[in-house]
């Protein structure tokens, strides 16, 4: 179960995971639950609230998740729930990360063992607590040198021999969806709005010169970073269409720089933005592969299922080469129902 920073909705999957020589999976069912206006507004603004209000929403969101699971998983025997929750704070440099959707509450409401709070341990080990998906790229999507997810942030995992490293490339749908909503749309379907806009050269230059892009890996981004570094660059005089056009170009440049050979697997909601994908192709030297619709939309949720399975087996599911932690770990907290 996965909820991303782009606030597209709640991704639910039911999977069988099989371990022989390698890990494989079978996707049995998948669905995205669109957030209503209450949850969209609540999740977008919860970081501004006090601790008491956040705790209250933590519990009510857990009940919401549990109810959705009970409906979604009806007639299926579920051994384990792996819940990412929804990120409210993520500032690993301050040793802070918070994903709401209390795992104990979900377990008690559903009567199913629940693994949650996947980022906390890695942050305590001086890691970024992100990205967590690369272990799944390594185990389930071995044949692709690059795996790129175009979600709230564009992130990448890169395989070299039997090793993998990963990082967030740049903000993406967290920006594109915000400025699409200002125009009355949930998102920029097919990049139609961006395509109508013009590139703001000064903004593009300022974006491309952000210090984050010269930092060494591992590194990760957050909503807090976006608020401090991106929004101050966007003047009120700029039209939303031009902002979208400029940001598409910026993202394409940054993503294209990172994929220079072999085949790149693209997933996530941004993959449906054909204008963005064409701009990425323009800047990239890799062969771009776009999989089936369910893999595009549910790859991250599938991998969080694997993270939960690895945790229950007490196996490594978080890699220090990816997060910068002092050691590999088995992240997540196991909650058994009363």
Name these PLM-found stretches.
Residues 283-303:
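Conserved phosphate-binding/catalytic loops in two-lobed NTP-binding clefts
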Residues 16-68, 74:
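Glycine-rich nucleotide/cofactor/substrate-binding loop typically near the N-terminus or early
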Residues 187-192, 252-253, 273-286:
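Extended, folded domain segments that form the structural surfaces/walls around functional sites
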Residues 78-79, 145, 262-264:
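Conserved acidic residues
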Residues 1, 92-97, 104, 108, ...:
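Phosphate-binding/catalytic loop of phosphoryl-transfer enzymes
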Residues 5, 9-33, 162-252, 261, ...:
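Conserved ATP-utilizing enzyme core subdomain
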Residues 49-103:
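Short beta-strand-loop/turn "lid" adjacent to the catalytic site in phosphate-handling enzymes
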Residues 88, 262-283:
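Glycine-rich phosphate-binding loops at beta-strand->alpha-helix junctions
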């Amino acid at each position: 179960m996965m909820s991303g920073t782009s606030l597209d909705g709640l991704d639910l999957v039911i999977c069988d995971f099989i371990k022989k020589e390698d890990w494989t999976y079978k996707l049995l069912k998948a669905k995205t639950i669109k957030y209503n206006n209450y949850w969209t507004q609540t999740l977008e603004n919860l970081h501004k609230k006090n601790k008491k209000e956040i705790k209250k929403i933590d519990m009510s969101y857990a009940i919401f998740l549990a109810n959705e699971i009970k409906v979604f998983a009806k007639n299926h025997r579920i051994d384990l729930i792996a819940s990412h929750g929804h990120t409210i704070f993520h500032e690993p440099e301050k040793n802070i990360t918070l994903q709401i959707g209390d795992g104990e509450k979900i377990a008690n409401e559903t009567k199913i063992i629940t693994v949650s709070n996947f980022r906390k341990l890695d942050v305590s080990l001086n890691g970024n607590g992100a990205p967590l998906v690369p272990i799944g790229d390594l185990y389930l999507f071995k044949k692709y040198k690059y795996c790129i997810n175009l979600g709230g942030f564009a992130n990448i995992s890169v395989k070299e021999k039997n090793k993998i490293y990963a990082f967030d490339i740049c903000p993406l749908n967290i920006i594109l969806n915000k400025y699409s909503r200002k125009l009355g749309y949930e998102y920029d379907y097919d990049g139609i709005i961006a395509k109508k806009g013009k590139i703001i050269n000064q903004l593009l230059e300022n974006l491309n010169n952000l210090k984050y892009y010269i930092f060494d890996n591992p590194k990760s981004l957050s909503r807090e970073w976006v608020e401090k570094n991106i929004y101050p660059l966007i003047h009120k005089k700029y039209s939303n269409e031009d902002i979208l056009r400029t940001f598409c170009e910026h993202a394409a440049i940054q993503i294209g720089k990172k994929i220079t050979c072999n085949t790149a697997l693209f997933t996530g909601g941004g993959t449906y933005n054909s204008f963005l994908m064409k701009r990425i192709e323009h800047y990239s030297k890799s062969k771009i592969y776009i999989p089936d619709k369910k893999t595009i939309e549910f790859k991250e949720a599938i991998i969080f299922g694997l993270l939960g399975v690895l945790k229950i087996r007490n196996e490594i599911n978080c890699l220090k080469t990816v997060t910068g932690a002092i050691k590999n770990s088995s992240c997540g907290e196991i909650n058994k129902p009363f």
